[in-house]
């Protein structure tokens, strides 16, 4: 009860909204993983499992073809509490014309991409109002869509696989006015995310540029200021037994599950306490100017490198123009590796 006595109702709801975010995926994923085999083997309700698997097979391509987004889910009140916990804000610097399609590259990944999720997978910060006529899709690991219930949940928020098949479908076969949000640095970039760090994994990440050229989608840089400040990440000194086990665990999970696992901590249920919740620190996602991209069926390496360099320049410009306004010093530099 000490937790309740130290917080007002709004703070309690904000904390609970963030607390549920990751566990709900585990809970929803555990239901079919446990229930389907159990019903199939140990009960007379085996037909329920058969129907669930049949539906998954029948509906297999939906997540790669735009999914089933729900305005109701994207506007849930819980996301407003989630937003206000930090708080999170979406800032537009230039209009996005509904006559084109876009790849919005999101930096940095963060230990967890809170800003990217709230700004693009929900309507809490007003994406539809800020960018009228644009439909956002947040790209993530395809493995999530192999799990019944979880796939329905994430599709309802406009989440899609970060696969070439899904990206090209959205950018060439769904008309115009679509924007696919890609966290270019991926999970590997999460390992670089420490308070005060402004490092993005981008030099060798050129696949999104190639897809943009093959589809003619404009490239849009975006940077979430504050996203690296909400967790402290522990990287133990090289040569120590802690680092040995940390690296072994990270390498194993990366190989088996394609997940980059961070050793992190934040606050607890109350401000000032220790735990794994993010710190209450503002996150502002600034969406930059779209970079026009020609459509080239088979772009060569030189062309990809050219537009990759132009994108890096656009991201650098966006960062430099807004860093002071959102809490960084004039001398802070964006490090691109």
Curated annotation (Swiss-Prot):
It is a multi-pass membrane protein. Its EC number is 2.3.1.-. Disulfide bonds: none annotated. It catalyses: 1,2-di-(9Z-octadecenoyl)-sn-glycerol + (9Z)-octadecenoyl-CoA = 1,2,3-tri-(9Z-octadecenoyl)-glycerol + CoA. GO terms for biological process: lipid metabolic process. It comes from the Eukaryota. The keyword ATP-binding does not apply. It is found in: Endoplasmic reticulum membrane. GO terms for cellular component: endoplasmic reticulum membrane. InterPro entries: DAGAT. Pfam families: DAGAT. PANTHER family: DIACYLGLYCEROL O-ACYLTRANSFERASE (PTHR12317), DIACYLGLYCEROL O-ACYLTRANSFERASE 2-LIKE PROTEIN 6 (PTHR12317:SF19). Belongs to the diacylglycerol acyltransferase family. This is Diacylglycerol O-acyltransferase 2-like protein 6. It comes from Bos taurus (Bovine).
């Amino acid at each position: 009860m000490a937790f309740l006595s130290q917080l007002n109702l709004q703070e309690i709801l904000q904390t609970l909204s963030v607390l549920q975010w990751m566990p709900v995926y585990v809970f929803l994923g555990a239901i079919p993983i446990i229930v389907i085999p159990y019903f199939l083997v140990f009960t007379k309700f085996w037909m329920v499992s058969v129907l669930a698997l049949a539906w998954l097979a029948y509906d297999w391509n939906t997540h790669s073809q735009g999914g089933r987004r729900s305005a109701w889910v994207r506007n849930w009140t819980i996301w407003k509490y989630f937003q206000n916990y930090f708080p999170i804000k979406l800032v537009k610097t230039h209009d996005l014309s509904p006559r084109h399609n876009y790849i919005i590259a999101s930096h940095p990944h963060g230990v967890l991409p809170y800003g990217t999720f709230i700004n693009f997978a929900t309507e809490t910060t007003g994406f539809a109002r800020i960018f009228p006529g644009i439909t956002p899709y947040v790209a993530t690991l395809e493995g999530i869509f192999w799990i019944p219930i979880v796939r329905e949940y994430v599709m309802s928020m406009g989440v899609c696989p970060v696969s070439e098949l899904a990206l090209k479908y959205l950018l060439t076969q769904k008309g115009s006015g679509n924007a696919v949000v890609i966290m270019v640095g991926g999970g590997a970039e999460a390992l670089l995310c420490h308070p005060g760090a402004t490092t993005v994994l981008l030099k060798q990440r050129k696949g999104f540029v190639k897809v943009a050229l093959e589809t003619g989608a404009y490239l849009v840089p975006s940077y979430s200021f504050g996203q690296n400040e909400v967790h402290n990440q522990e990287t133990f000194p090289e040569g120590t037994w802690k680092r040995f086990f940390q690296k072994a665990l990270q390498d194993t999970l990366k190989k088996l599950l394609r997940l980059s696992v961070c050793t992190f901590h934040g606050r607890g249920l109350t401000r000032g306490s220790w735990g794994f919740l993010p710190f209450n620190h503002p996150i502002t996602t600034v969406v930059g100017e779209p970079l026009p991209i020609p459509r080239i069926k088979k772009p060569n390496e030189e062309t990809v490198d050219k537009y990759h360099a132009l994108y890096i320049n656009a991201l650098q410009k966006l960062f430099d123009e807004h860093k002071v306004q959102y809490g960084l010093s004039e001398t802070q530099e964006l490090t691109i590796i």
